[in-house]
């Protein structure tokens, strides 16, 4: 215990602490951990769903930072026109191709026809089967079609020469195994 002088009186503090010094660092660590965790979740939300992130944080400075990062990401990483470059008055569809292929290949979009075709096929699938409700009749037809596809057909019989070649290969493998094993009598008995 260390005595400390305060206005002519002596106060004794356990553990030798001075007047005015903080107690434990635990509350500071808890607050710091909470802030870091919150920032981490906001960072993950930004990459998971950019629009929700923008709606949650309506700060103009954060919006400008997001716009700059999105423009950089579109130009440098994805090599496509910026998704925020279109005016907000234009109607945007929820299709993949309208989001990814904003312009033809000559304007900086995808110049790979296979990639363009793949995106178009995903877009067709998404607009026809996932995002739109189907009628009961269409659902029944699709269910019947999928059940017909799941019927297993028996395999076609193999030609006799293939069967004979397979039997000969198995017999040769067994003979080689018997020849190279130390315990060939026991292996022969089990076969």
Curated annotation (Swiss-Prot):
| Compartments where located | Host membrane
Q: Which parts pass through the membrane? A: 28-48
Note the topology in the membrane.
Single-pass membrane protein
**One GO cellular component term noted in the UniProt record for this chain:** host cell membrane
Q: Which UniProt keywords apply?
A: Host membrane, Membrane, Transmembrane, Transmembrane helix
Primary localization: host cell
- The source's superkingdom equals Viruses
In its UniProt entry, what is this protein called? Protein UL140
Instruction: Say which species the protein is native to.
Output: Human cytomegalovirus (strain Merlin) (HHV-5)
Q: Which gene encodes it?
A: UL140
């Amino acid at each position: 215990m260390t005595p400390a002088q305060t206005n002519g009186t002596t106060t004794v503090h356990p553990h030798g602490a001075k007047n005015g010094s903080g107690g434990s660092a635990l509350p500071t660590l808890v607050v710091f951990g909470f802030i870091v965790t919150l920032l981490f979740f906001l960072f993950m939300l930004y990459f998971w769903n950019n629009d929700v992130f923008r709606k949650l944080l309506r700060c103009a400075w954060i919006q400008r930072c997001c716009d700059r990062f999105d423009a950089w990401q579109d130009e440098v990483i994805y090599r496509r026109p910026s998704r925020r470059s279109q005016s907000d008055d234009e109607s945007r569809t929820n299709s993949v191709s309208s989001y990814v292929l904003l312009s033809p290949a000559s304007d900086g979009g995808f110049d790979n026809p296979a990639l363009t075709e793949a995106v178009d096929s995903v877009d067709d699938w998404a607009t026809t089967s996932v995002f739109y409700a189907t009628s009961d009749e269409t659902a029944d037809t699709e269910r019947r079609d999928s059940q017909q596809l799941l019927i297993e057909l028996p395999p076609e019989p193999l030609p006799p020469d293939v069967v004979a070649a397979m039997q000969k290969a198995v017999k040769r493998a067994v003979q080689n195994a018997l020849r190279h094993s130390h315990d060939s009598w026991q292996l022969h008995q089990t076969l």
